Amino acid sequence: MKIRHLLLLAGLVSAPAIVAAQQTALPSSSAAQASGDDDGGLTGSVSDESEWQDLGIAIPSFPTNASVPTAAEGGTTEALGRNVARVVFNDLKNNGLFKPVGPDALPAIAFPQVAAPAFDAWRGRSAEMLVQGFVKANEDGRLTVGCYLYDVALGSELARQGYVVKPEEWRRAAHKCADMVYSRLSGESPFFDSKIAYIAETGPKDRRRKQLAIMDSDGANHRFITNGQATALTPRYSPDYSQIVYLSYLNGAPRIYIYNIGTGQQKLVTSSTNPTFAPRWSPDGKWILYSMSVAGNTDIYRVSVNGGASTRLTDSPGIDVGGSYSPDGSRIVFESDRSGSQQLYVMNADGSNQKRISFFGGRAATPEWSPRGDQIAFTHLGGNFRIAVTDPSGGNMRFLTDSWQDEAPTWSPNGRIVQFFRTERGSGKTGIWQVDLTGRNERKLNTPVDGSDPAWGPVLP
């Protein structure tokens, strides 16, 4: 989308505000309608993945009722239909739960077949589930994208949704289609229609240029927010997606700023001249946790997003940083070296009842509480840097990655996937990676430059 203006003083560019994707009703298909509790013959769970990874899903190109020019990628509604199906295919392939087959390996279907599938033909291709849809140009210039999910074996319709979007927002319709399929088959909350903030890195490893950037969950629609004149670090989306809090060396010292996605404006979180860093949002979006160094001592503080006086939550002789709220806002996990090495601690939201939870050897840093509330992801330091998870009491710790230097985990909106950044040994090049909770499905996101400090935002409205 077109960048609207440049804020030279702050080194910022504005990001277009996200407009809610309008959902529209679709006509029912000729297939039998499955009941709401029909699981399509599946009995496994997302945690054990006993049969999910072998579930074959056919996703042919989305046809159009009439191929007409459109401002969307591809130039025509016919070409766009194939692109939409490709995005749906890639979303479902990359989450590690299913075995989809995309439009480039399947025959095209005619527009009338979208709501009247040829189930016998798809059974012959050993497809268990079928995703069909369409793209149609509206008189007002917008597009209607329809999405149907069918159980091939039962010959029934499991779900359907329609979306009305501007041509430049066509990828959102594709992600929402994939979300519908994923949620209906897995029982999990959606996460594809979301965005990621991260730090884009360029230059030699001893003089890295670090800019704030954002992109879709699959790496598309990339744009830089800051111009790189001042180093940016540790971004985090607000719970309503409207703002990003991050650390910037804009005036030479580490300070925390809140960037408004809709207006491109930013403001300081506190007026303190002391170094401030490691910002995190409260779940209700009313507070910012951050660390501040005063007279050589670093503690965790809380301040209203509207400014005002800060409240000190920790007061130890060590370095306390990296606070992350539990989903209900009642507790905070953070790292501290008060015991002599970096370890994980949990406290109540008011700073009371601080206790160490990491007793599994090595050091522990950069904790992030899962949106589900049942696990905490963190960086384990013990020879190398690995991403690990533990329950909030410090039990059931396990590693998700086994590389030289993986750090700074962030959760997908549904708590299903952990994203992090990996540094290559020797070159110092960094990249954004993600892994599911089994630790078996790992992949790298494509970014135009090196990337670090990822922050997965909420599902878009």
UniProtKB/Swiss-Prot annotation:
Q: Which residue positions does the secretion signal occupy? A: 1-20
Q: Which UniProt keywords apply?
A: Cell cycle, Cell division, Periplasm, Signal
Residues covered by region (Disordered): 28-47
Taken from the record, one Pfam family name reads PD40
Instruction: Specify the domain of life of the species encoding this protein.
Output: Bacteria
Cellular localisation: Periplasm
> What Gene3D superfamilies would the database entry show?
TolB, C-terminal domain, TolB, N-terminal domain
Assembly:
The Tol-Pal system is composed of five core proteins: the inner membrane proteins TolA, TolQ and TolR, the periplasmic protein TolB and the outer membrane protein Pal. They form a network linking the inner and outer membranes and the peptidoglycan layer.
**The protein, known as:** Tol-Pal system protein TolB 2
Native species of this protein?
Novosphingobium aromaticivorans (strain ATCC 700278 / DSM 12444 / CCUG 56034 / CIP 105152 / NBRC 16084 / F199)
